[in-house]
UniProtKB/Swiss-Prot annotation:
Residues 136-148 are annotated as: Linker 1. This is Neurofilament medium polypeptide. GO terms for molecular function: protein-containing complex binding; signaling receptor binding; structural constituent of cytoskeleton; toxic substance binding. Residues 412-845 are annotated as: Tail. Neurofilaments usually contain three intermediate filament proteins: NEFL, NEFM, and NEFH which are involved in the maintenance of neuronal caliber. May additionally cooperate with the neuronal intermediate filament proteins PRPH and INA to form neuronal filamentous networks. The gene is Nefm. Residues 291-411 are annotated as: Coil 2B. The modification Phosphothreonine is found at T564. It comes from Rattus norvegicus (Rat). PANTHER family: GLIAL FIBRILLARY ACIDIC PROTEIN, NEUROFILAMENT MEDIUM POLYPEPTIDE. One of its GO terms (cellular component) is axon.
């Protein structure tokens, strides 16, 4: 009894234990292997928050809980002291109770940390919702501002159009006014011109009047001079008559004698005088008539000329007025055309500017919408994760609540010594359904092969077309015979050989499929962890209801589960590394090529040589079998290729011996490369299996070294493979056949361990598609150029024939990726059954 009294009298012993367990539990919970989904929560909230919360905020709660538990334990030990001492198992019971207290305190600490994390996540969710609301309000405000700006822009554009219309109207009015002013100016100029013309006509008439007056004066002067002359002649005549009369009077005798003559002279003078007067009158009359007639003619001519000039001037003025009106109309039409062109250019510029601005705004809105969609998707994913965490926490909280209720009922039964039947409390089943939508966006995969065949045949004929035709017929017959033999050989080979699948080209889709498989495995591991935690909670509940021995077993199981979790995490990391190395090994093992025959036929296009793809098998055995089959097929094809060539050599009997030796030397190189690939893949896969079993980092380093050696061996094989293509010149019967083959090999891309090999077969470059990190390759091109030159000469006829035949084949392969969606629906149903047992106390009285 002294032991129980000491323990009851010293409650600090009970208080000392929970503090130690609390510190130890906090250290244990800080380890990465323990805790409820500590890895998944490390992404959302830091672990420092939970640790600081445990140190600061949980101290009073833990003290209170430890005090309550210590009081309950003291009462329990005091009431059961006699029974336990009589039973002889007091130390074991105390140890089990201390372990239960440690367990409950640790669970309380975890529960408080989970509650704090839930509050923190709720606060983050509220902040995110506030940001989303602010963004939505901002977008709404932007939209309202845009509407307001659009309305203002429309109004301003309407006003601008009105102003432009008014401006055009004013411009048209000004043009019309300018036209009127121009018309008036022209009319004024015309009137001034008419005035000048009339003044000039007046001056001309005045000049004519002056001239006519001068002519009249001259004529008057002539008349006066003639009158003076007549008077002078009359006076002279009279003087002469007087002289004659005087002479007559002097000689009277003579006069007497000549009396009869006196009358004759006077009559003669009278007659002469009358004749002279008549002549002078006639001359005067004729001169006057001539002057009058001349004056009348001149006046008539002047009047006629004036009328013609006036009519011509009127016509000229009319034509000028018409020309001015037409020019004015033309200027007005030009002005309207220029204004319309300016308006059209302005409208086009405005339309282009508006279109560019609208396109910019549309692009900006699309970018914003895409960003908001991405943000919403991210928030939805985070919200889904938080919901999953919340459901798990609700389950654990319910489990802890039931545990606490069970402990309280046990304490109450032990303290009050209440007897009652055994009952079980069954918790209602909780069903968690989580839908994970997994999308892989890949473009539809299509293979489009474009082949462009150009065949150019040039023939130059010099002499004797008959001989050339005979030569051509013989050559064609030989070629037809050779092609028939080749076709027969090919048919036999096809019957013997099975269908062979060619080496695949690993596209970016395989990488995405591997990543999708890794994500599915990670999700499956998370679900397994949740199930393990549900099992832990069930075990904890059963441990709370069972007796002392079961609690020890539960603790051992929890420790073992923690160790298995740590081991599981290590195994997950190792499994990921194994997957990466296996993917690399499979990629390196898959990259082998099978030669494709290219029979040469007379005047026929080059046959196509597509690169066929085969899906890679994940299992190592299947890959090895495929590699062996590929080796066999390659050997058969090499033998088949060598056989027709050797037959041709036997027929023509002049082929050098070096060519078959070279081709035979090529085949062992390929066989060695294939054997090295197979041995390397076997060793790597065996070592990976050993690593997963033994879980030692040293062997992982060895695997990496082997992978590096493998990359080196692949480099050697890749270096050997291009040495197989060689140029051959064959001289047969004086004929020279020069075959030039152009080969294009794709550049090596990818990691340092992965290299791609290009195998040249029959002048074709069949190279596998390259793999890119981050970028999808969609185009593969194979270009083959073949030139055959033949010169035939015959000494007898002296005819030469020069034939050049060039064939170019271009092959283009386009690959597109496929889009598909995977929906993974995982439903988790957890049923928890808690059983509480009421233990009867037996007290023995002394």
């Amino acid at each position: 009894m002294s032991y129980t009294l000491d323990s009851l009298g010293n409650p600090s012993a009970y208080r000392r234990v929970p503090t130690e367990t609390r510190s130890s539990f906090s250290r244990v919970s800080g380890s990465p292997s323990s805790g409820f989904r500590s890895q998944s929560w490390s992404r959302g909230s830091p672990s420092t928050v939970s640790s600081s919360y445990k140190r600061s905020a949980l101290a009073p709660r833990l003290a209170y809980s430890s005090a309550m538990l210590s009081s309950a334990e003291s009462s329990l030990d005091f009431s059961q002291s006699s029974s336990l001492l009589n039973g002889g198992s007091g130390g074991d019971y105390k140890l089990s109770r201390s372990n239960e207290k440690e367990q409950l305190q640790g669970l309380n600490d975890r529960f408080a940390g989970y509650i704090e994390k839930v509050h923190y996540l709720e606060q983050q969710n509220k902040e995110i919702e506030a940001e989303i609301h602010a963004l939505r309000q901002k977008q709404a405000s932007h939209a309202q501002l845009g509407d307001a700006y659009d309305q203002e822009i429309r109004e301003l554009r309407a006003t601008l159009e009105m102003v432009n219309h008014e401006k055009a109207q004013v411009q048209l009015d000004s043009d019309h006014l300018e036209e009127d002013i121009h018309r008036l100016k022209e009319r004024f100029e015309e009137e001034a011109r008419l005035r000048d013309d009339t003044e000039a006509a007046i001056r001309a008439v005045r000049k004519d009047i002056e001239e006519s007056s001068m002519v009249k004066v001259e004529l008057d002067k002539k008349v006066q001079s003639l009158q003076d002359e007549v008077a002078f002649l009359r006076s002279n005549h009279e003087e002469e008559v007087a002289d004659l009369l005087a002479q007559i009077q002097a000689s009277h005798i003579t006069v007497e004698r000549k009396d009869y003559l006196k009358t004759d002279i006077s009559t003669a003078l009278k007659e002469i005088r009358s004749q002279l007067e008549c002549h002078s009158d006639q001359n005067m009359h004729q001169a006057e008539e001539w002057f009058k007639c001349r004056y009348a003619k001149l006046t008539e001519a002047a009047e006629q000329n004036k009328e013609a000039i006036r009519s011509a001037k009127e016509e000229i003025a009319e034509y000028r007025r018409q020309l001015q009106s037409k020019s004015i109309e033309l200027e007005s039409v030009r002005g309207t055309k220029e204004s319309l062109e300016r308006q059209l250019s302005d409208i086009e510029e405005r339309h282009n500017h508006d279109l560019s601005s609208y396109q910019d705004t549309i692009q900006q809105l699309e970018n914003e919408l895409r960003g908001t969609k991405w943000e919403m998707a991210r928030h939805l994913r985070e919200y889904q994760d938080l919901l999953n965490v919340k459901m798990a926490l609700d389950i654990e909280i319910a489990a802890y609540r039931k545990l606490l209720e069970g402990e309280e009922t046990r304490f109450s039964t032990f303290s009050g010594s209440i007897t009652g039947p055994l009952y079980t409390h069954r918790q209602p089943s909780v069903t968690i359904s989580s839908k994970i939508q997994k999308t892989k966006v890949e473009a539809p995969k299509l293979k489009v092969q474009h082949k462009f065949v150009e065949e150019i045949i040039e023939e130059t004929k010099v002499e004797d077309e008959k001989s050339e035709m005979e030569d051509a017929l013989t050559v064609i017959a030989e070629e037809l015979a050779a092609s028939a033999k080749e076709e027969k050989e090919e048919a036999e080979e096809k019957e013997e050989e099975p269908e062979v699948e060619k080496s695949p080209v690993k596209s970016p889709e395989a990488k995405e499929e591997e990543e999708g498989e890794k994500e599915e495995e990670e999700e499956g591991q998370e679900e397994e962890e949740e199930e393990d935690e549900g099992v832990k909670s069930d075990q904890a509940e059963e441990g709370g209801s069972e007796k002392e021995g079961s609690s020890e077993k539960d603790e051992g199981e929890q420790e073992e589960e923690g160790e298995t979790e740590a081991e599981g995490e290590g195994e997950e990391a190792e499994a990921k590394e194994e997957k990466k190395t296996e993917g690399k090994v499979e990629e390196m093992a898959i990259k082998e090529e099978i030669k494709v025959e290219k029979p040469e036929k007379a005047k026929s296009p080059v046959p196509k040589s597509p690169v066929e793809e085969v899906k890679p098998k994940p299992e190592a055995k299947a890959g090895k079998d495929e590699q062996k089959e590929e080796e066999k097929v390659e050997e058969k094809k090499e033998v088949a290729k060598e056989s027709p060539k050797e037959e041709k050599v036997e027929k023509k009997e002049e082929k050098p011996k070096d060519v078959p030796d070279k081709k035979k030397a090529e085949s062992p190189v390929k066989e060695k490369a294939v054997e090295e690939m197979i041995t390397i893949t076997k060793s790597v896969k065996v070592s990976l299996e050993k690593d997963t079993k033994e879980e030692k980092p040293q062997q992982q380093e060895k695997v990496k070294e082997k992978a590096e050696e493998e990359g080196g061996s692949e480099e050697e094989v890749g270096d050997k493979s291009p040495q197989e293509s060689k140029k051959e010149d064959i001289a047969i019967n004086g004929e020279v056949e020069g075959k030039e083959e152009e080969e294009q090999e794709t550049q090596e891309k990818g990691s340092g361990q992965e290299e791609e090999k290009g195998v040249v077969t029959n002048g074709l470059d069949v190279s596998p598609a390259e793999e890119k990190k981050g970028e999808d390759r969609s185009d593969d091109k194979v270009v083959v150029t073949k030139k055959v030159e033949k010169i035939t000469s015959e000494g007898g006829d002296g005819a030469t024939k020069y034939i050049t035949k060039s064939v170019t084949v271009t092959q283009k392969v386009e690959e597109h990726e496929e889009t598909f969606e995977e929906k993974l629906v995982s439903t988790k149903k957890v049923e928890k059954v808690t059983s509480h047992a009421i233990v009867k106390e037996v007290t023995q009285g002394d």
